């Protein structure tokens, strides 16, 4: 079993922890808790770079080793890092579990060392018709991020 963690922070008071687990070649499970967000849906993605020298802006685009258009987690055509939305309650917190086969913790397409980013707005899953729908899901600004690192 391989485990990883990302601790998310922002200058706007958002904080959270995402735990990643993968057994063998099975899909990766992500268990997340985050607080300090406005209620509603927020896009969240794995971004290509684990670089936070300029905050979340330096994490690069969505992780997309296959060069596909943006889509929903269940779509065949999607970035590997397209993880959809998290639902934030009225208290500003969210807890969630997802399982995804395109975010491995081992091998040549491992997400270790990359960043996870939470966005200000909902991800339209590539179906919104906006000029940014097919690249970012029109999910708005990057409000919190953390680097995915191996956990002992």
From Swiss-Prot:
Cofactor(s) named in the record: Cu cation; Zn(2+)
Organism encoding this protein: Solanum lycopersicum (Tomato)
GO CC terms: cytoplasm
Pfam families: Sod_Cu
Subunit structure comment from the entry: Homodimer.
Gene name, Swiss-Prot/TrEMBL: SODCC.1
Claim: Disulfide bond is one of the keywords in the record: yes
Catalytic activity: 2 superoxide + 2 H(+) = H2O2 + O2
GO biological process, one term: removal of superoxide radicals
Binding locations of Cu cation: 45, 47, 62, 119
Cofactor remark: Binds 1 copper ion per subunit. Binds 1 zinc ion per subunit.
Binding site for Zn(2+): 62, 70, 79, 82
Location in or out of the cell: Cytoplasm
PROSITE patterns the UniProt entry points to: SOD_CU_ZN_1 (PS00087), SOD_CU_ZN_2 (PS00332)
Documented EC number(s): 1.15.1.1
Matching PANTHER family: SUPEROXIDE DISMUTASE CU-ZN -RELATED
Disulfide bonds: 56-145
Protein name (record): Superoxide dismutase [Cu-Zn] 1
Similarity comment text for this entry: Belongs to the Cu-Zn superoxide dismutase family.
Primary site of residence: cytoplasm
Role: Destroys radicals which are normally produced within the cells and which are toxic to biological systems.
Record keywords, A-Z: Antioxidant, Copper, Cytoplasm, Disulfide bond, Metal-binding, Oxidoreductase, Zinc
């Amino acid at each position: 079993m391989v485990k990883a963690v990302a601790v998310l922070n922002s200058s706007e008071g958002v904080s959270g922890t995402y735990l990643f687990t993968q057994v063998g070649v099975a899909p990766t499970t992500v268990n997340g808790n985050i607080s300090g967000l406005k209620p509603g849906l927020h896009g969240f993605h794995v971004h290509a770079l684990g670089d936070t020298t300029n905050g979340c802006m330096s994490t690069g685009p969505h992780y997309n080793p296959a060069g596909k258009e943006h889509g929903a987690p269940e779509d065949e055509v999607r970035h590997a890092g397209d993880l959809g939305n998290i639902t934030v309650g009225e208290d500003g917190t969210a807890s969630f579990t997802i399982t995804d086969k395109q975010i491995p913790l081992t091998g040549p397409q491992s997400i270790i060392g990359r960043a996870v980013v939470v966005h200000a707005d909902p991800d339209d899953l590539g179906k919104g018709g906006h000029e940014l729908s097919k690249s970012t899901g029109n999910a708005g600004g990057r409000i919190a991020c953390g680097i995915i690192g191996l956990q002992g």
